[in-house]
Design a protein with these regions (language model features):
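Structural recognition of alpha->loop->beta junctions
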Residues: 105-121, 163-188
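Substrate-recognition element of Asp-dependent hydrolases with the DxDx(T/V) motif
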Residues: 64-70, 74-104
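Substrate-recognition "cap/lid" segment bordering the active-site pocket of phosphatases
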Residues: 91-145
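Acidic, Mg2+-coordinating phosphoryl-transfer loop and its flanking beta/alpha structural elements
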Residues: 133-169
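Metal-dependent phosphoesterase signature
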Residues: 30, 39-76
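Active-site neighborhood of HAD-like aspartate-dependent phosphohydrolases
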Residues: 1-51
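Anion (oxyanion) recognition and catalysis
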Residues: 23, 79-82, 109, 144
Length: 191
């Protein structure tokens, strides 16, 4: 089975690392960066869209995407999916910084995520995978809307949303789902 795996907040702790970088760079004090309650959280941190994008570009160029360990369970989930014979494709909408692909490849290699392919695109539905895991509610809806099976990685910013999405606790949760006899399912996720 071909599995599309998002990076940020599925493998890599984007929110936590960005919070650390913002605090260290003096962009915002720690107290001004609460845990997000929704996916698009720039305004929760008091930043406008343009300012948010500019700081994220700077953070990426400063090495944000090449440092820091993966999320708990990500490596174990990856290993379990590999051991079950699945092909793993990193499919991310990362666009921050001057070299997002190189930064992503560097970080993946450093932590042993041996992807079969890497795709940087916001049109994830165009990547030929049997199932996707992502933390973005909009991305899950896009994938399902194009008839793709999509499983949402449970996070604080998507937990409260209504919907009958398949929900797992990160990549380890996806590995459990797919190795529990569900790996041959071909129907798209229920909408």
């Amino acid at each position: 089975m071909d599995i599309g795996v998002d990076v940020d907040d599925v493998l890599f702790p984007f929110v936590d690392r960005l919070r650390d970088w913002f605090a260290a760079a003096g962009v915002l004090p720690e107290a001004a960066m609460p845990a997000p309650t929704r996916y698009d959280f720039a305004d929760e941190w008091g930043l406008g869209d343009l300012e948010w994008v500019e700081w994220c570009h700077q953070a990426a160029d400063d090495g944000l995407f090449v440092t820091g360990p993966p999320l708990p369970g990500a490596q174990a989930g990856w290993a379990a999916l590999r051991a079950a014979g699945h092909r793993l494709h990193v499919v991310t909408a990362r666009a921050f910084g001057s070299a997002p692909a190189a930064a992503t490849e560097t970080w993946l290699a450093a932590w042993g995520f041996d992807a079969d392919s890497l795709h940087l695109t916001s049109a994830k539905h165009l990547v030929a995978c049997d199932v996707f895991i992502d933390d973005s509610p909009a991305m899950i809806e896009q994938l399902i809307g194009h008839g793709r099976r999509a499983v949402i990685a449970d996070c604080a910013w998507n937990r409260h949303l209504p919907g009958a999405w398949e929900r797992v606790d990160g990549l380890a949760g996806l590995a459990e789902l797919l190795t529990a006899g569900d790996s041959t399912r071909e129907a798209p996720c229920r909408a």
